[in-house]
C-alpha cells in the first residue's frame, strides 16, 4: 500500500511539481516487518477543500499534461483506495474494460464485507454487463477518443487543501492510475462532500471540456460515483452507501435497460441492513482512514 502511494505521489509530482507532497522514501521497519512507512515532504494544511477556481484549474492542468507511458489505461503498480486494493497494475486499450474490472473488484470486496444481497447482485451484473458498455464504449467509438489521464484516484474534501505557506492548492493520499479524466469527478457527486458544491464541477468543466457524447456526462458521472460510494460502504460500518449505490444503479438501469430491469426486479431483503449513519459520521470515519 505504501509503495502504491509513493508511486502515485511520484507520478503526480512528475507532471505538476508542488501539486502533491514530494515523496522521499517508503519501506518496512526492521524490528516490525509487518509495519510500513512513507516519508514525504511536509505541507501545512490550510483551507479544505481549496478555492474552486484555483483548485479545478490545477486539476485540469494535471489531467491535460499527463501522458500515459504506454498510451493505455492503467498503471505500472497496484494502488489503493484508502486501504482497499484497486485493479490498476495492468494496461488496457479500452477504458470501458478497465473501469468494468475495477467496479467488479469493488463489488467483490463489498460481498466479502457485507454478504451477498441477491437483488443488489443482480443489479450489479446488469450494470457491469450492459450499462458500462452502453455509457463508456461510445467514448472510444465512431471517431471519438479519450486520452488516458493521470488521476489522483480519491479526491474528496480531506485529500485536498490549500498550502498555508504558498496559498496554492495541493492534493495528497493518492491512489493514482491513468483513466478517463471525468472519473476523478465521480467522487464529487456525494452530497456529504463539500466538493459536491456546483462551483467545483462548473469550474472544472471550464478548464477541461466534457467528453463526447456531452449529453451523457451526468450519466457517466453517476456511473463513476458507484465505485467511490461502494468504497465508502465497505470502509464505514453502518453507513447507508450500499443502499445509495443500489438506488443509483436502479436509476441507470431504468434509463438505459428498463426491460431487463423489470425482468430481474423482486423483493429480496438485504442481510444485516444498517443504514442509519449520518453524513457527519461518514466524514469523520473517512478522515480516520
Write out the residue ranges for each language-model feature:
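ATP-binding pocket architecture of kinase catalytic cores
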Residues: 1-97, 101
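Hydrophobic packing residues in well-ordered alpha-helices of helical domains and bundles
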Residues: 2, 52-55, 120-124, 242-245
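A general structural signal marking secondary-structure boundaries and capping sites
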Residues: 13-16, 63-72, 110, 135, ...
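An alpha-helical support segment within catalytic cores of ATP-dependent transferases
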Residues: 28-31, 67-152, 163-166, 274
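Residue-level detector of conserved, well-ordered beta-strand and adjacent loop positions
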Residues: 41, 172, 246
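Active-site Asp-x-Gly
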Residues: 95-100, 104, 108-109, 145-150, ...
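Anionic ligand-binding catalytic core segments
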Residues: 113-116, 196-198, 213, 274-277
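ATP/Mg2+ or Mg2+-diphosphate-binding catalytic cores
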Residues: 232-289
Amino acid at each position: 500500500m505504501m509503495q502504491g502511494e509513493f508511486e502515485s505521489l511520484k507520478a503526480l509530482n512528475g507532471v505538476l511539481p508542488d501539486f502533491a507532497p514530494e515523496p522521499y522514501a517508503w519501506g518496512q521497519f526492521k524490528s516490525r516487518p509487518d509495519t510500513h512507512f512513507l516519508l514525504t515532504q511536509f505541507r501545512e494544511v490550510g483551507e479544505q477543500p481549496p478555492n474552486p477556481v484555483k483548485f479545478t484549474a490545477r486539476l485540469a492542468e494535471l489531467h491535460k499534461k499527463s501522458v500515459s507511458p504506454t498510451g493505455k489505461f492503467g498503471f505500472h503498480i497496484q494502488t489503493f483506495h484508502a486501504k482497499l486494493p484497486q485493479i490498476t497494475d495492468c494496461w488496457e486499450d479500452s477504458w470501458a474494460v478497465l473501469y468494468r474490472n475495477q467496479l467488479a473488484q469493488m463489488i467483490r470486496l463489498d460481498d466479502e464485507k457485507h454478504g451477498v444481497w441477491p437483488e443488489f447482485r443482480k443489479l450489479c451484473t446488469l450494470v457491469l454487463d450492459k450499462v458500462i458498455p452502453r455509457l463508456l464504449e461510445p467514448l472510444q467509438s465512431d471517431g471519438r477518443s479519450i486520452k488516458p489521464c493521470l488521476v489522483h484516484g480519491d479526491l474528496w474534501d480531506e485529500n485536498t487543501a490549500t498550502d498555508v505557506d504558498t496559498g496554492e492548492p495541493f492534493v495528497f493520499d493518492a491512489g493514482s492510475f491513468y483513466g478517463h479524466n471525468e472519473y476523478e469527478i465521480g467522487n464529487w457527486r456525494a452530497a456529504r462532500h463539500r466538493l459536491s458544491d456546483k462551483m467545483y464541477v462548473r469550474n472544472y468543466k471550464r478548464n477541461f471540456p466534457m467528453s463526447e457524447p456531452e449529453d451523457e456526462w451526468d450519466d457517466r458521472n453517476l456511473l463513476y460515483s458507484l465505485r467511490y460510494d461502494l468504497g465508502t460502504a465497505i470502509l464505514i460500518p453502518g453507513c447507508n452507501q450500499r443502499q445509495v449505490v443500489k438506488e443509483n444503479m436502479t436509476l441507470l438501469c431504468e434509463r438505459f435497460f428498463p426491460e431487463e430491469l423489470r425482468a430481474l426486479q423482486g423483493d429480496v431483503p438485504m442481510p444485516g441492513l444498517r443504514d442509519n449513519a449520518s453524513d457527519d459520521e461518514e466524514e469523520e470515519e473517512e478522515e480516520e482512514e
